[in-house]
Amino acid sequence: GHIYGPTITETDSRASAQFTQNAIEGEDIVMKSAGMQMRSYCYVLDCASAILTVLLNGKSGDAYNISNKASVCTISDIALALAHAGGQKVVYENATDEEKKGYNLMSNSSLDAAKLEKLGWRACFDLEEGAEATVKYMKKLRG
């Protein structure tokens, strides 16, 4: 899944990282599409606990999807959550033909974490809580 949280760097080019940068810098988030592609997002602390769960309870050699079913949403949804957490808004603009060339055309890349959940793992942060924690902590780090 797509891991987000206060671990992003200023050079991180992922959409969620750019949205976070906008939110903590007091800028509106500009979307160059409707952002209707579905993605699996997972807050970084939930990701860490998922990895620990696999290390403690998983079967060696097996693969496990890390995904929070409460945070499977559109790209627009995460933009709105981060904008709200930062007191900003999301603005939708038309993309140039050049910008459209870089789009990921996959409409749904959400993951199923049922196998991980069978090991006893549960996410603690929904999308709004993760967005709030991310923006709050990043603002504190930046002073």
Q: Residues of each region from the PLM?
A:
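An acidic site on a long C-lobe helix of protein kinase domains
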Residues: 15, 43-47, 74, 126-127
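Conserved C-terminal active-site "lid" loop/helix of NAD(P)H-dependent oxidoreductases
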Residues: 44, 63, 74-76, 99-122
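Mid/C-terminal beta-alpha module of Rossmann-like enzyme folds, strongest
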Residues: 57-101
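C-terminal lobe/hinge of AMP-binding adenylation domains
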Residues: 34-36
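Non-catalytic, hydrophobic alpha-helical segments
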Residues: 47, 51, 66, 75-78, ...
